[in-house]
Amino acid sequence: MVRQSIGLIALQLLNLVSVAQAATDAKRDLSEKPKMPYDPNTAADCTWWIDNDGSKNCEDIPEYWDIEMVDWLMWNPSLTLDCGNFLKGRSYCVEAKSVLPTQTSSSTATTTSQKPTATVSPLPQQDGLTKDCTKYYNVQSGDTCQKIVDQYMTFSLAEFNKWNPAVGPDCRSLFVGYYVCVGVPGTPTKPIGPSPTQPGIPKSCNKYYKADRGETCQGIADKHRLKLNDFYKWNPSVTNDCVGLWQGYYYCVGITPAFELKAFYHADCTGKLHGQTTIASGSDGACFDTNCQVASIDTFIVGDCPNGQVQISYWEQPGCTGKWFGYGYSSRGTCRKLWTEGWKFKAVHLRCASEKDDCVSKRTCTYDPEPSRGICM
């Protein structure tokens, strides 16, 4: 009996020591002042900090310190909604005066999920950020728009600019410390295409080739019947002297066009074929001379125009010059009869665009009046 009592006491003492050690370890992780660098946008009234030594996951912190996920994200705006950007060697806030965590019993603590919801939108943000954003990124020093696109490889530069219009088309207004949108409903969650690849390959790439020892850019272009300039354009990291071509890496040798179409003499996409043109993905479109020989266009169903919408801009003279007669619209997989069946214009500019976004719809521009008679006589 005495031996059993002594053993029981020893076991209890061991448990107490373990609990005390765990409490001591927790205290070592917690401090009133940050010991590591921290984001300047962290809650200014933070009262307790943790130093990220890489031993814990971001998602586990709220439960470990008995705080709400929304508070954890609010106090540490450098973290993304999916708990990304939790950097080793940085300090993070786990209590602030602005919103103090409440102590709840274990029976009530499990009634809500610790995962952030789509309604939590981290700050600061720039004006105009898309309202349906589901994934955010905190801009770091040295970032560029293209660098962010290359980092995720799940969206194009055009999509990034659409979601974050305030950064500007030249990316001059990309501000360090601000959140930008890097995902909306439907955005892929994994990089597109094989691996490894170099940065800069367009999202519209639909055909890849693995470079072998001794190959050259010209040789790869010839093998796939490409123009060398197109190969360089689709694979900017190799540079125009091909010194960046690496053995074992995949390179883009084909892209999905924005759209492709055929132009016909009759208004129902029949009769003599005047020509066929392909508009490159990510471009601002191209001018197509009709020269009074085109009354309709048949747009292929394959392409990556948003919502399939194709803008047709009518011009008086070849080369898209002279008077401008406004816009018309078509969509992929559709035969479209052209304005005046081709008799009052000689060129069209074709590109991906939404009707609601054009200057006529917004009443910020005016087009020239329709000629009283055809100009093709």
UniProtKB/Swiss-Prot annotation:
Keyword Nucleotide-binding annotated: no
One Pfam family per UniProt: LysM
Gene induction: Expressed constitutively with no significant difference during colonization of banana roots.
Region forming the signal peptide: 1-22
Keywords tagged on the record: Chitin-binding, Repeat, Signal, Virulence
Region (Disordered): 104-124
GO MF annotation, one: chitin binding
Biased composition (Low complexity): 104-119
Residues covered by the LysM domain: 135-182, 207-253
Superkingdom of the organism of origin: Eukaryota
More info: In plants, chitin acts as a microbe-associated molecular pattern (MAMP) that is recognized by lysin motif (LysM)-containing plant cell surface-localized pattern recognition receptors (PRRs) that activate a plethora of downstream immune responses.
Job of this protein: Might have a role in sequestration of chitin oligosaccharides (breakdown products of fungal cell walls that are released during invasion and act as triggers of host immunity) to dampen host defense.
Comment text on domains: The LysM (lysin motif) domains are small globular domains involved in binding chitin in eukaryotes. Lys2 contains one LysM domain.
Membership in a protein family: Belongs to the secreted LysM effector family.
Name listed for the protein in its UniProt record: Secreted LysM effector Lys2
Gene: Lys2
